[in-house]
A protein has these predicted regions:
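Long recognition/docking surfaces used for binding and targeting
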Residues: 162-260
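Nucleic-acid nuclease catalytic cores
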Residues: 48-97
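A short beta-sheet element
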Residues: 627-685
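Active-site metal-binding core of divalent-cation-utilizing nuclease and nuclease-like domains
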Residues: 2-35
Length: 740
């Protein structure tokens, strides 16, 4: 319930407004603005009593108005119960008559917010501008709907169909709560909505209706729960929002798949809507452009492009061009139907979206050399269809000079397997820019690490060209309590501004998140990854100190988890090149200061238990994931380990390091004499650059040796006794663990 201004219950109404003229009667709730009553709300605990609720609310308003001390123009009736959902009716007193409060041509179906109330009173014509639900509201509603479908025992793969079908039915009209055939009514309303479209062919209408019909065999158990789902969607003012510029279906469906119980098991991942808009804004679209997304999902990219085109359109001729402008493919029938609906809900979409694979020979040839813009977020790790094939197919669809923007798994741009492809790509096309995206962009639905690729089709990379490299680590959302919620510090506006400046030939100042590199350094299949090229921010003593504390804390956590590990502490763990010291305040590759080796052990399960630390790529306990017996193992001779994901740890004990598989540990052997404090300094230098390494771009030796480190500005001869500190910690821990 939106409380807007002052929110008063029955007794509070009596205390604050004793002169309303109501006698002993009082409404359930009154809402005030600036101390003046503006809304009356009356509630009933049965769904069928919704007319009573709104009639009583209007009657209270009229009595108060006749008293002439206050004028209340908004009445709200609420009826229902948790198990069946709620109906909300909002009326406005216009010229002495009560009318539905309207937004975008549809009745408002939720308790209005303060902003919506102010808008209604300002217009004074029984209309308002509904506030688009926030990300949090979409998430909460999606979780509720998903839980209802789970309770109704609707199969996971069939749940998205319910969302699409009910949304389409509500788009067509209001659903009668007294009906005895709720599924039948919803199917009939969905069918009517699609059949009335002037932009779908008869064949596509039939296919859409087939894809969206809720059959009794699969959905018969849903009937007792359907009104709750309708209630939740109405709470979001679905009918009014569908008529606005907001991508209601896309935003709700994205939240539904991300946060609904079991829904991520469907393996469907869609690009967040603020990222599809960002991608559209990066390259821009114009009236007359043809736009394609060959793996369009629910149509996020197409909706963003379509909406951008509508803003540029000022005449009927432009509208006709827009109707023919967007094309897409998706293989999932339900997802395909939702993408068609998404364009349908935009009002002018012709929906040139096909339910087939874009990689099939016929489909691929049908779109070759026809488009000005291609957008893409291909399936991640799909067997037999690597991401590069979708990129190639997108580039084929473009005319010469057409622009491509793709959100793609970052491994394509970093790993050795795709080196030849990267080299070949720049022979055929122009790589314009790369922007790495936040690691948690798809949380909690997927853990894919992605980057945006921007390219110009069928124009070989000019030798003297520049390439824009950006690192987007804040997209305006953060992880909080299992959700991604809005936060401050959004980099997207700045990144967009700098990219446009780059495209227009302006000077780009090198920073910690943006750099322009010469194309010749990417020749021969070199990485496209921004993480390889963006410079590292220089650390001050405070930064180093904070990182050092984390390194020390990791050692303490390790001893807490494995107290017997102290038996492997080695007083000589750092005796290297006693007479030679490193150059001071020098920035150079890591290999200048350390030799880099790879661990040689087998998997942990290959060894029996003991007291020797086994170091892998875990994060919580210094990389130590177990203790193994000394017999027949090969101890490491370097005092720093670096995990596959770029985290460096001090290892002041005899230990062994994982050497098999993709998560192999790298071992650093100092080339110079170093004190413990100096080792901590270099560890901090490495850990400050963890952002460079991910599952898609691991800290392999060839990358690690080129990592830029800056040596200390002075020698730290006054050292710390790390062995003594850790031994003391173990003793104190044992004492505190005693129960007396």
């Amino acid at each position: 319930m939106s409380k807007g201004g002052d929110f008063l219950e029955e007794q509070e109404i009596t205390d604050c407004f004793p002169d309303l003229g109501l006698g002993l009667n009082r409404p359930d709730f009154m809402l005030c603005l600036h101390g003046e009553p503006v809304i009356i709300i009356e509630t009933k605990n049965e769904l069928c009593k919704y007319k009573n609720a709104i009639n009583e609310a209007m009657e209270y308003c009229e009595i108060i108005n006749r008293n002439k001390k206050h004028e209340i123009k908004i009445a709200i009736g609420v009826a229902g119960e948790p198990e069946n959902g709620y109906i909300v009716i909002v009326k406005y007193l216009k010229d002495g008559k009560w009318e539905d409060l309207i937004s975008h041509g549809n009745a408002v179906t939720a308790i209005i917010s303060k902003t919506e109330c102010i808008n209604a009173l300002a217009s004074d014509d029984a209309t308002t501008e509904v506030v688009i639900p926030s990300t949090r509201e979409f998430i909460d509603a999606a979780i509720e709907v998903s839980n209802i479908l789970r309770t109704a025992k609707i199969e996971t793969t069939l749940r998205p169909k319910v969302v699409g079908t009910v949304t389409t039915a509500l788009y067509y009209g209001d659903i009668d709560i007294t009906t005895k055939d709720i599924l039948g009514d919803i199917n009939r309303m969905m069918t009517s909505a699609i059949n009335e479209s002037q932009h779908f062919s008869d064949a596509k209408k039939a296919k859409l209706i087939e894809a969206l019909t809720l059959g009794l065999n699969d959905f018969g158990s849903l009937s007792p729960f359907i009104f709750r789902i309708i209630s939740i969607l109405k709470r979001l003012n679905i009918r009014a929002v569908l008529q606005s510029d907001a991508d209601f279906l896309g935003m709700f469906y994205e939240a539904f798949l991300r946060y609904g119980a079991d829904n991520n098991a469907m393996g469907i991942v869609f690009t967040p809507r603020h990222i599809t808009k960002f991608c559209t804004d990066l390259v821009g679209v114009e009236i007359g452009h043809k736009i394609i997304d060959i793996t369009c999902g629910t149509g996020g990219f197409l909706v963003s492009a379509f909406d951008a085109l509508k803003k540029e359109c000022h005449n009927d001729e432009g509208k006709d061009l827009i109707r023919e402008s967007v094309y897409g493919f998706d293989t999932n029938p339900t997802v395909w139907a939702l993408s068609c609906l998404n364009m349908f809900f935009r009002g002018d979409g012709k929906s040139n979206i096909e339910n087939t694979s874009s990689l099939e020979k016929g489909a691929r040839s049908s779109v070759r050399n026809k488009f000005n813009r291609a957008f893409l977020n291909p399936p991640f790790h799909q067997e037999g269809e690597p991401e590069r094939e979708f990129i190639d197919a997108s580039m084929e669809s473009l005319i010469q000079g057409g622009l491509f923007v793709g959100v793609v798994y970052a491994g394509v741009f970093a790993d050795e397997e795709n080196k030849v492809w990267r080299e070949d790509f720049m022979r055929k096309h122009t790589l314009i820019g790369m922007i790495s995206l936040p690691d948690e962009l798809f949380y909690p639905n997927a853990s894919a690490i992605t980057s945006i690729m921007i390219a110009r089709a069928k124009v070989p990379q000019p030798k003297n060209s520049n390439i824009f490299m950006g690192r987007l680590y804040n997209d305006g959302f953060e992880k909080l309590k299992g959700k991604r919620v809005e936060c401050s510090g959004n980099q997207i506006p700045h990144m967009l501004q700098e990219f446009h400046k780059f495209m227009n030939g302006g000077h780009i100042k090198e920073s910690n998140d943006i750099i322009v590199v010469r194309a010749n350094i990417l020749k021969d299949g070199a990485e496209y990854s921004p993480q390889q090229y963006i410079p590292q921010q220089k650390l001050d003593y405070k930064d180093v100190d904070n990182l050092n504390k984390k390194t020390l804390m990791s050692l303490f956590q390790t001893i807490t988890s494995y107290p017997e590990i102290t038996e492997s502490l080695d007083d000589g763990f750092m005796q290297y090149n006693k007479d030679k010291r490193f150059p001071l305040n020098k920035t150079d590759n890591l290999e200048t200061f350390f030799d880099v080796k790879t661990g040689k052990s087998k998997g942990l399960k290959s060894y029996s238990a003991g007291i020797v630390p086994y170091v892998s790529s875990g994060d919580d306990t210094n990389g130590v994931v177990g203790l193994v017996a000394e017999d027949g193992i090969e101890l490491c001779d370097g005092c720093i380990t670096v995990s596959a994901f770029g985290t460096a740890y001090l290892q002041p004990w005899n230990y062994m390091a994982r050497g098999n598989g993709g998560s192999s540990v790298r071992v650093l052997v100092p080339k110079y004499r170093m004190t413990v404090k100096e080792l901590f300094w270099f560890i901090a230098q490495i850990n400050s650059q963890r952002w460079r390494f991910t599952y898609a771009r691991q800290a392999i030796k060839s990358r690690l040796i080129k990592l830029k480190l800056t040596s200390p500005p002075e020698y730290f001869e006054k050292d710390i006794d790390i062995i003594g500190k850790l031994t003391d910690f173990k003793t104190k821990l044992a004492e505190l663990s005693e129960i007396e």
